[in-house]
């Protein structure tokens, strides 16, 4: 049967079987709808995606043709259980098609279903209603255009993305199944070639949806490389192109059939798309003829020809995408990019002549239509985006890159936009665009047919630009058109040249045809990193060379030009065509790569897309399978951030369809491109190679099917793949861990706020050994399901039956049945895997998976006592848990290092388990992913499920923090949880031990770990991690397991309703979460901009006995985001344990318990406000920190409550809390004294997780560890830790992510494309490099950098790295301020003018005025004076609260807050509860806050009282004094070494300093002068000195 028939039949079968979604024509919609109905807005869980789940199984079955039979059993079973009946009719067709050698390319359409028609219908039906929720529509097609109900439902929460993993399903579940089977076949060149004979336009439902929902006005024509074209390029490209072509064929056919039949209805359903639908129908009708017809003819035939078109050119670059076949990736409407940039296509036809800003000129030298095209698009952008990039190469088409970045001269862009706007106003683009749409669609059909060949060829374009750029002939490629462009003979010559390069093109005569050359790098969202992965981003099944959404990743967040990509082809008249790239400049990098790898890249991009789309699962699995996994892991560290960003972009591309999704991915995307070209090239090339060779599918955000080796365990793959697919689909909306072609794993949070978590097992599997990965993926998928099932069973057993019902009656049944039998098998397996004891959870997952396998294999065993599974889990758990956690870590982003650490830890615990660990880790990751899915899907019931899961994990007896982190990430924020895997990685970095080995049984008894739910509140992911004593982990593993489960459930519940299933077990998580948070923050930091879902920093210390965790952070997250409200309720009940256990879990757990129990109990209630309750407890501080950092959610995972936290915390901390909230964490204040220190450490840990992650990922973990140890011991340590966290937090919101991204930040000029690789040209992430000077940065960056430096720097050892400007207190790196007292001449002048009393205070870091502003400086000055007067306590609090808010608002705050805090703490040590961390920071207000933390309190006290005369100073006093002096921090060690005490200091002369200490003369003079001034006025000077501190 031809694919069209198959798809049509599948559609019908799916439609018939899909009763839930009458609107949706395809089963995928039905499944999505049913999943939506079942799962509500969050289809992350299997229960929500019940049908999809079966479909996923089918996918897996299809992928594993050998496994299809067993698959069919499972399908049957799943159809029975999951109600997945959609697949059967299609499956028969699939098998037949497979046997017939028909390859289904739908897998390649990972995000976008291969059936453009179906997708369009679905998208239309879903999109038309959901058009208002633009985000939904893109998501819909990503997810295969689930039914509109689901789309709309999902739109708010990570829209249909969850389905995305089952994107094939979304397109058509049946299609998806075909795809799974087809993927392998599609990779076979022979099959694909045969299949590609008809190459209709391939329009992914996503694209269609984008068109309909977003009304994309740009026609994103992605023409697959024609098979014949591909023949020259390479077999793999052939595969990709064939697949793409086949997909196009199928899609076109489906579209034709659907458009003609049900398609019209679906098209009509997409309200705005209705004209497009008619056009599409016309195109489809004319699709066959279009190739032969000139655009004018087509237009005439279609009847949509505009006057300009009739006159002349088929230069339709951007059409309103309403009718265009390729729905825009982006959600309807520009989710993120302001001004509807790109909503209307920018149709700049000719770039040959400079754009004149005044005229409505069409930029169309050759095309008269261009005016119309551009003219109607006044909304195109905000005048920044379009610019004419002059190219020196006359022959090469001039490409104009419209990027939101004003990389290209903004004026020109504005002019272009102006001209565009004028043209838009003058010309009614809607009619013309509709005509264009018809024409272009026809043309595109022709061109795609023609250009399928041409695209690959264009890559070979003599001009390097074109080489990689996908040459898409947007304009109808007809000699008539070029003839119309008479003067454009040059252009046609160029076109001809390009086409000559494209000579392979079937229609050489069409050389006259204009080709829009879209460099994939330019087109794809991700440029550098995503040159290949542009396909991945597009991979949602978008085979289009032009990626549908052009996402401008601005600081604002993803800005999809996406609805419209502007492709300007050189005009036949010879004018160079403009390439308006709504895609972020990152695309340019791709262009370079493409040029470099012209032939391959041209093919590769197509393949990248095709395979990225189709290979997403393969990529994961194959990467896992291939030895690349190790390299991938290695690459992960280097490329992880870029790929995370890439994947985030991809997720964004997929999630951009969701309204919220774009934000996170955008940053990630550009970050990805931000990676240097070389990095991208290396990665992309490696990815391309891997894809070309391995045909690794780029990780689709939701892997519809993990394509494990076909030969691999079919049952597991089927079950696991299915589960993975379902889970991934479910999770797709949530954190999506995308495995880059490089094998890097990315967890991308969908902006919708639902964390998109690709199952770690799958995604992370790539990192692990291929063989293990396959098995692990399978096992892990099964284990995930099994664990979920077992957890459900346990829950049922443990009175969690209700929870199971919540989760999914179907899942519960399936899992229960499977669990029984599988648990037995898994018991044996677990016993067998005793080496893999870490697989306890993993095996639980395996049990689930294998049970699923066994369901087909032996359902009889399902009835075995659940007790066996539980017992087995418990038995195996202790060892396996750690291993799985390690595995998870390994699979996590930067997990190699973490893996080594965790593996070492786990090996130390269970060396024999090391081998099992890799698999188990992956499995655990999968479990975690499943947990997240469950969490997301079953937020209400998730707690029970998670609890059971966690119980199982904890039963494993090993730290399964990863599950918690994931639960946290699931807790609510796409951005908030940048990546569950990132969190896991961070957690693993913090230590496998942190994972509180929570035995499944011990409920919340152990206070060892508190879990901070990571939520993106505001822009920054506020992932406060919990701190748990690793010792306590071991001690109370069972309790922690329970707690952890509860915590996860609570976190998830917190996301929904923080209701810990085990009320006591809210605090299962330990430092690993912290690490995770830091990782996530780093990852999410940029992404988090849009979603400030401060996940409640559930810095709930687990009280040892009650195990009551205050989901403080959850409650606080309430302020930040969805989680917040629920958490509060839970925390109050847990109040006693509310305090986070300081991360130094071993010590602090007890103190933390004490601390927690007292304030915490109240805290929980306040949690909702923020972690204020926490603040009342020492704990609050994590929230409080977040909140005070409200500007930077990082601190405040509680940020949502960061402000709230400030207010709430302040009461507990009295005066300090305000200042703390402003800067530090009130929670410390709440704790007060040692306890507060402990909680401080906790806070610090959390903060570190965020802030450190920003400054340094390792630091965050180490800080947490340090805090853990020190928090118990010293308040100062805690304080410093806290400070670190605080600084890191403020950075975390902005810089943290950038820190992750920063290596990638580049600006490239490639082929006239200016590629800016970051939202900011060079983000503040630079603070990462201590030697760089903040002053080098622009004010914003400077402020953020200073925040980072001050907070993180001070916290860590600001003294060592940072020096405070004496005047404004701005923290500068020593390298810069090394010999200077002031950061700027202005400060020096101010200091001279105000030297009298405030000078010293200003000199200290207290005044952040430099950045903050005069007011803030005045506040600082007043604070300094107050400090000097010892009025600090009374005055400091209000002032701090005042100044911090100001400072908090600005990045400068951290410096301010530190000084203020220091001042506060100085006046009264009691203030420490306020900011015990602050107190530490204050002492070290100078950069050496950490170093001086011990002495600082004294010094501040001394300051408060008059500091003793200099002559009585000790060496430490002198060192602190010197440390305070700007530019002298570097010499503190010299003073200490020289043993210069107060008396010696008085005797010092400049020559002594210069000669003996090797100081520069300037600092020596300053020191001497300072000493002289202090000698003259001892108290003021001393006050000044203390102020400095």
UniProtKB/Swiss-Prot annotation:
Gene3D superfamilies xref list: 3.30.60.160, Transcription Factor, Ets-1
Tissue specificity statement from the Swiss-Prot or TrEMBL entry: Salivary glands.
Binding site for Zn(2+): 1365, 1368, 1383, 1387
UniProt-recorded Gene Ontology molecular function terms: chromatin binding; DNA binding; DNA topoisomerase binding; histone binding; protein-folding chaperone binding; sequence-specific DNA binding; zinc ion binding
GO cellular component assignments: nucleolus; nucleus; polytene chromosome; PRC1 complex
Annotated InterPro entries: Formin_Homology, SAM, SAM/pointed_sf, Znf_FCS, Znf_FCS_sf
Phosphoserine: modified positions: 1145
Basic and acidic residues: compositionally biased ranges: 1-15
Modified residues (Phosphothreonine): 1148
Bias (Low complexity): 18-28, 60-80, 119-139, 272-285, 1157-1180, 1230-1244, 1260-1290
Biased composition (Polar residues): 154-174, 1189-1221
Subcellular location: Nucleus
Domain of life: Eukaryota
Reported impact of residue 1545 to A: Little effect on Scm-binding activity
UniProt cross-references to Pfam families, sorted A to Z: SAM_1
PROSITE patterns listed in its UniProt record: SAM_DOMAIN (PS50105), ZF_FCS (PS51024)
SAM domain segment(s): 1513-1577
Cystine residue pairs: none
SMART domains the UniProt entry points to: SAM
Biological role stated in the UniProt entry: Polycomb group (PcG) protein. PcG proteins act by forming multiprotein complexes, which are required to maintain the transcriptionally repressive state of homeotic genes throughout development. PcG proteins are not required to initiate repression, but to maintain it during later stages of development. Component of the PcG multiprotein PRC1 complex, a complex that acts via chromatin remodeling and modification of histones; it mediates monoubiquitination of histone H2A 'Lys-118', rendering chromatin heritably changed in its expressibility.
Assembly with partners or alone: Component of PRC1 complex, which contains many PcG proteins like Pc, ph, Scm, Psc, Sce and also chromatin-remodeling proteins such as histone deacetylases. This complex is distinct from the Esc/E(z) complex, at least composed of esc, E(z), Su(z)12, HDAC1/Rpd3 and Caf1-55. The 2 complexes however cooperate and interact together during the first 3 hours of development to establish PcG silencing. Interacts with the SAM domain of Scm via its SAM domain in vitro. Interacts with Trl in vivo and with corto in vitro.
Protein name: Polyhomeotic-proximal chromatin protein
């Amino acid at each position: 049967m031809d694919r069209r028939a198959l798809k049509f039949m599948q559609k019908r079968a799916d439609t018939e079987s899909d009763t839930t979604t009458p609107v949706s024509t395809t089963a995928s919609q039905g499944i999505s709808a049913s999943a939506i109905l079942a799962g509500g807005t969050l289809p992350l869980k299997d229960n929500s995606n019940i049908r999809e789940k079966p479909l996923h199984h089918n996918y897996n079955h299809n992928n594993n043709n050998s496994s299809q039979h067993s698959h069919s059993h499972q399908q049957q079973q799943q159809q029975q259980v999951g109600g997945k009946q959609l697949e059967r009719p299609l499956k028969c067709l699939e098998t037949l098609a497979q046997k017939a050698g028909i390859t289904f390319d739908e897998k390649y359409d990972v995000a976008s279903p291969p059936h453009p028609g179906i997708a369009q219908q679905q998208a239309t039906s879903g999109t038309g209603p959901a058009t208002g929720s633009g985000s939904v529509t893109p998501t819909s097609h990503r997810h295969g255009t689930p039914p509109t109900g689901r789309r709309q439902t999902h739109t708010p929460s990570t829209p249909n993305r969850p389905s995305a993993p089952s994107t094939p399903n979304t397109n058509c579940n049946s299609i998806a199944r075909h795809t799974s089977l087809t993927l392998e076949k599609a990779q076979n060149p022979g099959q694909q070639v045969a299949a590609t004979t008809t190459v209709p336009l391939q329009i992914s439902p996503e694209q269609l949806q984008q068109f309909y929902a977003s009304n994309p006005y740009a026609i994103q024509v992605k023409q697959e490389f024609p098979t014949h074209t591909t023949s020259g390029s390479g077999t793999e490209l052939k595969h990709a192109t064939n697949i793409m072509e086949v997909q196009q064929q199928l899609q076109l056919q489906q579209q034709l059939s659907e458009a003609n039949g049900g398609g019209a209805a679906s098209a009509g359903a997409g309200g705005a798309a209705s004209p497009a639908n008619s056009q599409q129908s016309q195109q489809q009708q004319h699709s066959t003829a279009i190739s032969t017809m000139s655009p004018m003819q087509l237009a005439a035939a279609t009847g949509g020809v505009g006057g300009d078109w009739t006159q002349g050119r088929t230069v339709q670059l951007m059409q309103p995408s309403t009718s265009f076949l390729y729905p825009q990736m982006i959600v309807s409407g520009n989710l993120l990019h302001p001004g509807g940039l790109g909503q209307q296509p920018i149709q700049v036809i000719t770039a040959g002549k400079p754009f004149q800003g005044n005229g409505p000129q069409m930029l169309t030298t050759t095309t008269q239509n261009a005016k119309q095209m551009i003219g109607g698009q006044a909304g195109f952008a905000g005048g920044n985006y379009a610019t004419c990039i002059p190219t020196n190469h006359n022959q090469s088409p001039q490409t104009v890159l419209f990027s939101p970045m004003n990389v290209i001269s903004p004026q020109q862009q504005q002019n272009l936009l102006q001209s565009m706007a004028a043209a838009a106003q003058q010309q009614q683009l809607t009619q013309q665009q509709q005509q264009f749409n018809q024409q272009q669609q026809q043309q595109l059909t022709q061109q795609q047919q023609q250009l399928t060949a041409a695209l690959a060829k264009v890559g070979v374009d003599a001009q390097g630009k074109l080489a990689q750029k996908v040459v898409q002939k947007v304009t109808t490629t007809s000699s008539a058109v070029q003839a119309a462009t008479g003067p454009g003979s040059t252009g046609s010559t160029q076109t001809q040249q390009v086409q000559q390069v494209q000579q392979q093109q079937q229609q050489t005569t069409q050389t006259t045809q204009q080709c829009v050359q879209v460099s994939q790098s330019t087109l794809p969202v991700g440029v550098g990193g995503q040159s290949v992965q542009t396909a991945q981003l597009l991979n949602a099944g978008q085979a289009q060379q032009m990626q549908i959404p052009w996402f401008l990743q601005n600081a604002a967040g993803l800005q999809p030009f996406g609805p419209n990509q502007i492709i300007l082809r050189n005009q036949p008249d010879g004018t160079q065509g403009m390439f308006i790239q709504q895609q972020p400049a990152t695309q340019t990098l791709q262009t370079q790569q493409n040029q470099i790898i012209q032939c391959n890249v041209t093919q590769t991009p197509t393949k990248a897309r095709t395979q990225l789309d189709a290979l997403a699962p393969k990529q994961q699995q194959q990467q896992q399978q291939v030895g690349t996994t190790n390299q991938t892991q290695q690459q992960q560290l280097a490329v992880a951030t870029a790929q995370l960003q890439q994947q985030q972009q991809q997720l964004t591309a997929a999630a951009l369809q969701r309204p919220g999704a774009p934000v996170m991915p955008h940053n990630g995307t550009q970050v990805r491109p931000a990676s240097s070209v070389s990095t991208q090239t290396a990665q992309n090339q490696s990815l391309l190679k891997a894809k070309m060779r391995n045909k690794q599918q780029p990780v689709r955000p939701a892997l519809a099917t993990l394509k494990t080796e076909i030969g691999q365990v079919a049952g597991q793959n089927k079950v696991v793949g299915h589960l993975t697919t379902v889970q991934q689909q479910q999770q797709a909306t949530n954190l999506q861990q995308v495995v880059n072609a490089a094998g890097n794993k990315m967890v991308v949070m969908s902006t919708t706020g639902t964390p998109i978590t690709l199952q770690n097992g799958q995604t992370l599997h790539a990192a692990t050994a291929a063989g293990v990965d396959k098995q692990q993926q399978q096992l892990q998928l099964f284990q995930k399901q099994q664990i979920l099932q077992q957890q459900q069973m346990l829950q049922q057993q443990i009175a969690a039956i209700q929870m199971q019902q919540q989760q999914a009656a179907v899942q519960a049944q399936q899992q229960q049945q499977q669990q029984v039998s599988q648990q037995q098998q898994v018991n044996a397996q677990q016993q067998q895997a005793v080496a893999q004891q870490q697989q306890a959870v993993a095996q639980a997952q395996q049990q689930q998976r294998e049970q699923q396998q066994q369901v087909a294999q032996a359902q009889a065993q399902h009835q075995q006592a659940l007790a066996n599974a539980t017992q087995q889990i418990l038995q195996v758990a202790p060892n396996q848990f750690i291993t799985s956690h390690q595995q998870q870590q390994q699979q996590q982003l930067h997990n190699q290092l973490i893996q080594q650490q965790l593996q070492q830890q786990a090996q130390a615990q269970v060396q024999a388990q090391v081998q099992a660990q890799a698999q188990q880790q992956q499995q655990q990751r999968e479990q975690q992913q499943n947990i997240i899915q469950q969490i997301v899907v079953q937020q209400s019931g998730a707690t029970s499920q998670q609890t059971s899961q966690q119980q199982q994990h904890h039963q494993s007896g090993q730290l399964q923090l990863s599950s918690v982190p994931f639960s946290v990430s699931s807790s609510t924020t796409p951005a908030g949880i940048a990546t569950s895997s990132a969190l896991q990685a961070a957690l693993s970095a913090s230590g496998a031990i942190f994972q509180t080995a929570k035995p499944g049984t011990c409920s919340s008894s152990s206070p060892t770990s508190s879990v901070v739910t990571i939520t993106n509140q505001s822009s920054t992911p506020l992932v406060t991690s919990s701190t748990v004593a690793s010792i306590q982990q071991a001690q109370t593993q069972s309790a922690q397991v329970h707690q952890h489960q509860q915590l996860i459930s609570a976190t998830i519940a917190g996301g929904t309703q923080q209701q810990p299933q085990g009320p006591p077990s809210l605090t299962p998580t330990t430092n690993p979460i912290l690490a995770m948070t830091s990782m996530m923050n780093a990852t999410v930091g940029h992404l988090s901009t849009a979603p400030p879902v401060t996940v409640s920093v559930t810095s709930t210390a687990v009280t040892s006995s009650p195990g009551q965790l205050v989901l403080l952070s959850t409650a606080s997250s309430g302020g930040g985001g969805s989680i917040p409200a629920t958490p509060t309720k839970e925390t109050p009940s847990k109040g006693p344990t509310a305090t986070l256990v300081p991360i130094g879990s071993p010590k602090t757990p007890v103190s933390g318990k004490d601390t927690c129990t007292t304030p915490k109990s109240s805290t929980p209630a306040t949690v909702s406000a923020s972690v204020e309750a926490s603040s009342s407890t020492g704990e609050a501080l994590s929230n409080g920190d977040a909140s005070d950092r409200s500007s930077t959610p990082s601190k405040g995972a509680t940020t949502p409550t960061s402000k709230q936290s400030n207010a709430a915390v302040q009461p507990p901390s009295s005066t300090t809390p305000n200042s703390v909230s402003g800067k530090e964490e009130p929670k410390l204040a709440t704790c007060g004294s040692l306890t507060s220190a402990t909680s401080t450490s906790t806070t610090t840990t959390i903060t570190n997780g965020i802030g450190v992650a920003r400054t340094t990922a390792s630091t965050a973990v180490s800080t947490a560890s340090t805090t853990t140890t020190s928090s118990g011991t010293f308040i100062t340590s805690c304080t410093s830790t806290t400070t670190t966290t605080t600084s890191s937090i403020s950075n975390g919101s902005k810089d943290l992510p950038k820190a992750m991204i920063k290596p990638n930040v580049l600006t490239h000029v490639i082929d006239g494309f200016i590629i800016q690789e970051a939202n900011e040209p060079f983000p503040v992430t630079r603070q990462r490099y201590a030697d760089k000077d903040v002053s080098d940065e622009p004010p914003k960056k400077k402020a953020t950098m200073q925040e980072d430096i001050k907070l993180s720097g001070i916290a860590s050892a600001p003294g060592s790295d940072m020096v405070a400007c004496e005047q404004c207190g701005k923290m500068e790196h020593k390298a810069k301020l090394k010999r200077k007292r002031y950061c700027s001449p202005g400060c020096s002048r101010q200091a001279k003018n105000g030297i009298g009393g405030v000078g010293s205070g200003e000199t200290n870091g207290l005044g952040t005025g430099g950045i903050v502003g005069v007011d803030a400086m005045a506040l600082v000055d007043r604070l300094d004076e107050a400090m000097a007067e010892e009025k600090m306590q009374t005055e400091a609090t209000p002032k701090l609260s005042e100044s911090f808010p100001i400072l908090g608002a600005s990045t400068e705050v951290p410096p301010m807050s530190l000084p203020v805090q220091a001042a506060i703490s100085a006046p009264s040590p009691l203030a420490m509860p306020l900011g015990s961390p602050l107190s530490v920071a204050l002492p070290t207000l100078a950069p050496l806050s950490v170093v001086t933390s011990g002495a600082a309190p004294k010094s501040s006290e001394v300051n408060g009282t008059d500091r003793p005369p200099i002559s009585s100073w000790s060496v430490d006093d002198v060192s602190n004094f010197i440390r305070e002096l700007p530019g002298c921090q570097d010499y503190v060690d010299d003073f200490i070494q020289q043993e210069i005490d107060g008396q010696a200091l008085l005797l010092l002369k400049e020559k002594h300093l210069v000669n003996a200490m090797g100081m520069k003369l300037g600092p020596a003079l300053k020191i001497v002068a300072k000493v002289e001034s202090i000698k003259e006025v001892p108290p003021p000077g001393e006050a000044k000195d203390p102020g400095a501190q």
